[in-house]
């Protein structure tokens, strides 16, 4: 399990994997429909609309209306998949998602693409750091972020089978390959990627690769880091997190999102109530995004392996002085 980790980008863009899966399952299940808000080219849903024109709807720049239409389709037995950038798929439609979908208990799957800093040149207005927090606070919502194409393929049938709203936080570009096809994937259950006895690193999305790089560096310093891919932030896998925290006695979280209300908060809530251990949250700290390429923004907001290593040293030192 603790094999050397090498950063390799997938050839396939994650958005294309998503549309491949939509097409594959839509051919077998006529309940599946796709909705977009004037971003069909950006999401690759245009390809779905060309092959299945009667089952794709572009509502225009009207995201809240898109959620209302999706709720109506779900009420009639369809399984709608909606898409917009995370900023518009979460904060702009929050009331409609809360009332029209979640309160009504409807089976709508919502895709938010370009999560966190990966919005890059679209800048702060399109860069949602708070979407995980928003969606995690809506009753009955499942919040999932695939780490790579292989994991998304494993997750898709489970997302379809889940009777209820799901928010999928989707990187549009090629993901770093984590070899997650070797995992036994279960929605709502964290994946153990690396074993260690000194510190637990909980990561999600693009930060999983950073966590594995950090674990390699820490190993060279004599610190054994256990790495869990918490792909489903809600429901939160308390069992796996507590098992690891009790083993290591120190925890670091890493997320491409605000530390307020997201993975870091979920871990703090779980550990605070069940297993108080030193915790350090790596993520965006109460600020808006800005224009820049991903590598620059990683450094700007501290979303790096270097920052995870620093956090790991901090919590292990605190553990040793308790």
From Swiss-Prot:
It catalyses: 6-deoxy-6-sulfo-D-fructose + D-glyceraldehyde 3-phosphate = 4-deoxy-4-sulfo-D-erythrose + D-xylulose 5-phosphate; 4-deoxy-4-sulfo-D-erythrulose + D-glyceraldehyde 3-phosphate = sulfoacetaldehyde + D-xylulose 5-phosphate. CDD domains: TPP_PYR_DXS_TK_like. Keywords: Carbohydrate metabolism, Thiamine pyrophosphate, Transferase. One of its GO terms (molecular function) is transferase activity. The keyword Oxidoreductase does not apply. The keyword NADP does not apply. It is an enzyme of class 2 (transferase). InterPro entries: PDH/Transketolase, THDP-binding, Transketo_C/PFOR_II, Transketolase-like_Pyr-bd, Transketolase_C. Its cofactor is thiamine diphosphate. Its EC number is 2.2.1.15. Belongs to the transketolase family. Forms a complex with SqwG. Part of the sulfo-TK pathway, a D-sulfoquinovose degradation pathway that produces 2-hydroxyethane-1-sulfonate (isethionate). Catalyzes two steps of the pathway: the formation of 4-deoxy-4-sulfoerythrose (SE) and xylulose 5-phosphate from 6-deoxy-6-sulfo-D-fructose (SF) and glyceraldehyde 3-phosphate, and the formation of sulfoacetaldehyde (SA) and xylulose 5-phosphate from 4-deoxy-4-sulfo-D-erythrulose (SEu) and glyceraldehyde 3-phosphate. This is 6-deoxy-6-sulfo-D-fructose transketolase subunit SqwH. It comes from Clostridium sp. (strain MSTE9).
